[in-house]
Amino acid sequence: MATVVRLTRIGRKKSPFYRIVVTDSRKRRDSGFIETIGYYNPRMEEELKFDADRLAYWKKVGAKVSDRVAKITSK
């Protein structure tokens, strides 16, 4: 099973809100996931919370990080 850390969209139409999740790469964007490690709200200034220890753990065990997650967590 290839795991990936990516965003899943929640929230209303025209008002996005994202969870940072670990999931199987073959699953759809918003389908089942293994673990939620944080959230990101692009409409608010500096609204990003995630567990850096869990992100490091998943990277260590081989999970790939999506480009968008890598960009927002590197800030």
Curated annotation (Swiss-Prot):
Please provide, alphabetically and separated by semicolons, the GO molecular function terms listed in this UniProt record.
structural constituent of ribosome
What this protein is called in its record is Small ribosomal subunit protein bS16
Q: Which GO terms describe its cellular component?
A: cytoplasm; small ribosomal subunit
Q: Which GO terms describe its biological process?
A: translation
The yes or no answer to whether the keyword Membrane is present is no
Q: Write the record's keywords in alphabetical order, separated by commas.
A: Ribonucleoprotein, Ribosomal protein
Keyword Ribosomal protein listed: yes
A single Pfam family it belongs to is Ribosomal_S16
**Recorded family membership:** Belongs to the bacterial ribosomal protein bS16 family.
Domain of life according to the entry = Bacteria
Q: Which organism is it from?
A: Campylobacter hominis (strain ATCC BAA-381 / DSM 21671 / CCUG 45161 / LMG 19568 / NCTC 13146 / CH001A)
Cross-referenced SUPFAM superfamilies, in alphabetical order? Ribosomal protein S16
PANTHER family for this protein: 30S RIBOSOMAL PROTEIN S16, SMALL RIBOSOMAL SUBUNIT PROTEIN BS16M
List the InterPro entries. Answer: Ribosomal_bS16, Ribosomal_bS16_CS, Ribosomal_bS16_dom_sf
